[in-house]
Amino acid sequence: MININIFEAASYTNISALKAVMHDNWILKEVRIDYNTLIGIPLENMPEKFPFKAIFYSGDLKIEVRICSLTAGYPGTGPHDLAKILDFLGIQYDKEDIFTQKKRGEDGFIRLTYKC
């Protein structure tokens, strides 16, 4: 397995970073969003807590791309940049899931999984 962690300070730079690391032979299998609206973006550089994960395969090789500075469920640039990445990856999603807190659980997390 290969882990690629994108830790950009501004969410709008994440799509450029994602484009830079992706390869044409990667097949997207799943996207997971796990964003804590009560805490926000994790301050520590702990990739396992990054709110965005895209899981690709190249043959039998699993590639997990994690992105730190993307947000969901509130106004601002983060959700718009998250939507741009989902569009770039060809993910079908409900815009309300990204731009509103309708999917927010009692623990404050918005958890979304998209299978490809």
Question: Where do the language-model regions lie?
Answer:
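Charged, low-complexity surface segments at secondary-structure and domain boundaries
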Residues: 1-8, 66-72
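Short coil/turn linker and secondary-structure boundary residues
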Residues: 2, 10-13, 77, 91-93
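Negatively charged, low-complexity tracts enriched in Asp/Glu with abundant Ser/Thr
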Residues: 3-23
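Short amphipathic alpha-helical segments that mediate assembly, nucleic-acid/protein binding
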Residues: 14-15, 79-82, 106
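Hydrophobic, Leu/Ile/Phe/Ala-enriched alpha-helical segments that form helix-helix packing faces
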Residues: 18-25, 86-90
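Amphipathic, interaction-prone secondary-structure segments
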Residues: 20-59
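Acidic, low-complexity, intrinsically disordered interaction modules
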Residues: 43-90
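Mixed-charge, Lys/Arg-enriched low-complexity segments
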Residues: 83-116
